[in-house]
Regions:
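N- or domain-start disorder-to-order transition segments that initiate the globular core
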Residues: 1-28
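Histidine-acidic residue clusters that define the catalytic metal-binding segment
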Residues: 2-10, 150-191
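M16 family metallopeptidases and their MPP-like homologs
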Residues: 18-20, 25-51, 60-111, 143-168, ...
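Hydrophobic side chains in well-ordered alpha-helices
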Residues: 101-102, 181, 202-206
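A common structural junction motif
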Residues: 106-117, 206-210
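Acidic/histidine-enriched alpha-helical segments
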Residues: 112-135
């Protein structure tokens, strides 16, 4: 098991950073996630945000750029953990890629929307994709039955809420509202960063962004 080392100041920071020794591995892994309370009114926005940020204006751009620059795997996803919803950014690169390069790529993906915004075209495209994913889940009878059972047994709690969002909530989400939600998330959400590789103090500079 890989031991994790916390690197924390004396006060409780909004951005917490953990290092894991990874010299024996062939790649470096950088994971950043926003830790959000799982609520019905924001669950679908968060799930859609992951779709929009992953694809952006160019459906193959970010992933292709990461592959060309770093021989890397890049992804954004949403994970449900108990009563929390995690918006997760992950970048896995070859060992010869500098930590500063990884951070520059991550920052570009994180903060470019604050300058460029989201277009209605992109948001509508990703809404269709997310809606199809959610409808496909309903077609999986066993998975749908498990989800319905959880909704009933955990009724009235965050555990009953789907971390994948709800198709019926997509219609009311537009580009402007989604950008406002993302801006608030960047300014207020708890952030955790995990890095598996050779320890580099450059990672601590992420705290300046949150």
């Amino acid at each position: 098991m890989v031991a994790m080392e916390k690197c924390e100041p004396k006060y409780e920071p909004r951005c917490r950073i953990f290092f894991a020794e990874g010299q024996k591995f062939r790649t470096n892994l950088l994971v950043l996630f926003f830790d959000l309370p799982l609520k019905r009114e924001t669950a679908t926005k968060t799930a859609l945000l992951a779709e929009v940020l992953r694809q952006g204006e160019d459906p193959t751009g970010a992933a292709r750029q990461a592959e060309l620059l770093f021989g890397a795997h890049w992804d954004i996803s949403v994970v449900k953990k108990g009563g929390r919803q995690l918006l997760l950014f992950s970048l896995e690169t070859l060992k010869n890629v500098e930590t500063e390069e990884m951070l520059a790529f991550l920052r570009e993906r994180l903060f470019a929307p604050m300058q460029n915004g989201f277009t209605e075209k992109t948001v509508e495209r990703q809404k269709k994709i997310l809606r199809q994913k959610l409808e496909n889940q309903r077609d999986d009878k066993k998975a749908f039955a498990r989800r319905r059972a959880l909704e009933e047994t955990a009724k009235g709690t965050a555990l009953a809420i789907s971390g994948d969002g709800y198709a019926e909530d997509l219609e009311e989400i537009g580009a402007e509202g989604l950008l406002a939600f993302y801006r608030e998330l960047l300014e207020t959400a708890r952030v955790q960063v995990f890095f598996c590789g050779e320890k580099d103090e450059a990672l601590l500079s992420l705290r300046q962004n949150f």
